[in-house]
Curated annotation (Swiss-Prot):
The protein's name: 1-(5-phosphoribosyl)-5-[(5-phosphoribosylamino)methylideneamino] imidazole-4-carboxamide isomerase
Catalytic residues, chain numbering: 8, 131
Lineage, highest ranks first: Bacteria, Pseudomonadati, Pseudomonadota, Betaproteobacteria, Rhodocyclales
Chief place of localization: cytoplasm
The protein's Enzyme Commission number: 5.3.1.16
Keyword Transport: no
Keyword Cytoplasm in annotation: yes
GO biological process: L-histidine biosynthetic process; L-tryptophan biosynthetic process
Organism expressing this protein natively: Azoarcus sp. (strain BH72)
Amino acid sequence: MLLIPAIDLKDGQCVRLKQGEMDDATVFSEDPAAMARHWIKQGARRLHLVDLNGAFAGKPKNGGAIRAITDEVGDDIPVQLGGGIRDLDTIEHYLDNGISYVIIGTAAVKNPGFLHDACGAFPGHIIVGLDAKDGKVAVDGWSKMTGHDVVDLAKKFEDYGVEAVIYTDIGRDGMLSGVNIEATVRLARALRIPVIASGGIASLTDIEALCAVEDEGIMGAITGRAIYEGTLDLSAAQSRADALRAPGGAA
């Protein structure tokens, strides 16, 4: 189980939003590259970046901060990035500049043909991000609900060739209210590709609960507010996850 620290970028700073509200942001660092370095020292093996301005504007907005992070981590740590990715040129630019995986969210739901083309052009580098509440997919920075069932849509995108699905329970993200294990497992069981859980992780208990269902197809978990506010120690949590995965690991 990979624990993946989230670095959410707004106006060049590392912030956290509560339930996706841009005007409810807490600034945790004015130096995102230093934050990336910190999480790697704590044992992170992958980083999750979100261009929040880009997600709302529909085009990249934090290029300087993103490049500073990829320069900092080099080729050693895979970096996945989402937010404002709406065309193939943007994907190519990011992949050419140190990003390992590009996350397509709203654009995949609104324009499935774009996701299909992206998977064909950049095989192995496209992750789809599905944000859902009560099993239904949300788009546009969570501001609009759709009628799409998250499992049905994920299965369709799996057939396109996406590398993984990031599943965010938007009723829980940034609220430290615990992971929606049932919904995450339901999705993972329906797919052949890995699922990365997101939203609601508050403590080591949540990590242990995810590790217990890891074999259902859950490869990792994105954590944000918990590691920034100190309710979860990233290093201890990754060590615990590794121990549970080891042969004979205690439950």
